[in-house]
């Protein structure tokens, strides 16, 4: 189903809202602005329906937040240090968007664009976007698509694809936030498992500084499920950024059929499993969500949503030595990244 809103987006046109439904009764809502996930409502075994995603009260309210709620991120998700990288001996300077660094593709990233609806029905929608040579400092013309698909086993399947006519780092993701308790509550009470042996420490600006580190013996060891609060702010790597905001190099190594992460609501009525072909997941515990508009009368507070962003490791264009696929896309190649979020009602 496709609807247009009376409210106008920054380009002066209505927001276009799309609804996906499956045979299990799950309903997902999206909009074309930012190719954004707005809502995911899952029927529980007790007959109630639970909202699993953070979101705003109306499409236009998304212009009043800086948390990237549910948005498609590109060309390059996460941070690039000092907004520059070197490729084939040439230094490329990008548009900074967080201090001196570039975050999530620049000040006018893909989250702030209207994506075109290529096709859609009750089960899937395909969005497309063109990004010109020099956009946010990136070289080459880039064509991108994202397909959202809702399956009958309650998976939101997200496939990003891109092509370029000049070599360019490409790292697309969705910045959806989850609260499986279905309300404005503290996600640190969720139980979390991340199947990763290494994580990437960062400085206060979120920039990697010492390379990958084993999770063993640290508060970053989520290989066995644990309550997020159990070791929250337990070491300096967390305290630098007010909690968890770190990339984990996954054991799955790009195998999208293996579970990358598993989340349980505090009341254990809803679970989430994450599958991805991306090499890493960025676990963000919502450390700076405070003041973000919500669906209710009160804004979100810090730690009321968590993100599990599938991606290359942050600042990968400056670290070709890291054990993951090359983040540079070249002419004649296709970037493709698949992530699935599966909800399991108890």
Curated annotation (Swiss-Prot):
EC number: 5.1.3.3
Pathway per the UniProt entry: Carbohydrate metabolism; hexose metabolism
One example GO MF annotation: carbohydrate binding
InterPro entries named in the record: Ald1_epimerase_CS, Ald_epimerase_bac, Aldose_1-epimerase, Aldose_1/G6P_1-epimerase, Gal_mutarotase_sf_dom, Galactose_mutarotase-like, GH-type_carb-bd
Record-linked Pfam families: Aldose_epim
Chemical reaction(s) catalysed: alpha-D-glucose = beta-D-glucose
Gene3D superfamilies cross-referenced by the UniProt entry: 2.70.98.10
Assigned keywords, A-Z: Carbohydrate metabolism, Cytoplasm, Isomerase
Broad enzyme group: isomerase
Protein name: Aldose 1-epimerase
Organism (species): Escherichia coli (strain K12)
